[in-house]
Structures are given as C-alpha cells and as structure tokens.
C-alpha cells in the first residue's frame, strides 16, 4: 500500500508519541566520530535543535559538543518563514517562536553551520525524510549546500520511524546520514 506524505506524517507522529519514551539510550559518540572523520580536528559549527513533540532529545550531545569547544547554533524562523541559524550557548535563555519551538534571541549572531542535525518524522534507507511539512529544512539545506559545498546533514530519529519508502518531490533534500539508537544509516 502506497501512502502520501500527509498520511505518513500522521502515522509516524503518532508512533513517535507512543514509543519514544521507551527508547532509553542514544549513542551520540557516533556523531563525534563522524565529525572527526569528516572534519579532522577542526572545531566546526554544529546546528542542532531544541527537542519538542517527542523528537530525539539531543541536548546532552549539544552540551558535550559545547564543552569540546564546538560552536552551537539553533534554527530561527524569521521573515517570510526563512530559516537561519543563530549562535546559542547552552545556558542562554530560549524564546518561544511563532511555531511553538524554542529559539535563541533573534539578535544573536547568524552563523552558517558545517553540520546540521535535523529532527525527523519518518525516514527511509535511501536517506529521504519527512518533516513537519513546512519545507524549512529542505529550503535551508538547498540554500546552504550552494554556499558551503561540504555541508553535512544528519537526521535524528528512532528506529521505529523507518518507513519502507518515502515519497519524494524535486524540493526534498536527501540527507547525508541518519542516526538512530541502533546505529547509523549511510549512503549506499
């Protein structure tokens, strides 16, 4: 049976709400190993997200990354629903956005990251993803990949969010990697 994105989004959001609290441990060392492999010892800028709606909680990873002197940025949705990344230190206050997500101050410095961590609603083994349906990450990744050729995109999901096939359109941006509690999905 073939599903459209709307149906898949609804199904996997429900699954995530139901099962996410059962997953106890994520091994974020895998991301640090990827960073070392891709960027050597360069102190890169990492774009994370503040988890909501049962997304994978990456806060311990962001805190560890900050302690290792990586710059941390979080997404901010601005004028015309354009997504940028603003600097954020772990203990700085965050503010509720128009979409109910937490963001750094809009006056914080805008930085283009080297590695972008993307929350996922669903994914397939071909590194396709479904998000919340607004296209923020797809548009943003398209734009940044033209500016920074070696940008690395990493999806974060639970293994139960895997879908046999994700329907794709010309606007969808394929990820470089997907991390789950069971390991890493790499390009074939």
Kindly give the residue locations of the regions a language model identified.
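Internal, well-ordered alpha-helical segments in soluble enzyme and binding-protein domains
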Residues: 8, 31, 136-140, 174
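A residue-level signal for conserved active-site and pocket-lining positions in enzyme catalytic cores
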Residues: 12, 48, 72, 117, ...
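Surface-exposed, charge/polar-rich loops and edge strands
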Residues: 1-3, 17, 108-116, 125-128, ...
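N-terminal active-site beta-alpha-beta segment that forms phosphate/nucleotide-binding
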Residues: 1-96, 101-104, 108-111
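Short secondary-structure boundary segments
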Residues: 50, 76, 120, 158-160, ...
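Short glycine-rich anion-binding loops that position phosphate/pyrophosphate groups of nucleotides
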Residues: 52-54, 121-125
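Charged helix-capping and loop-helix junction motifs
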Residues: 63, 132-138
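Short, well-ordered alpha-helical microsegments
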Residues: 55-58, 137, 163
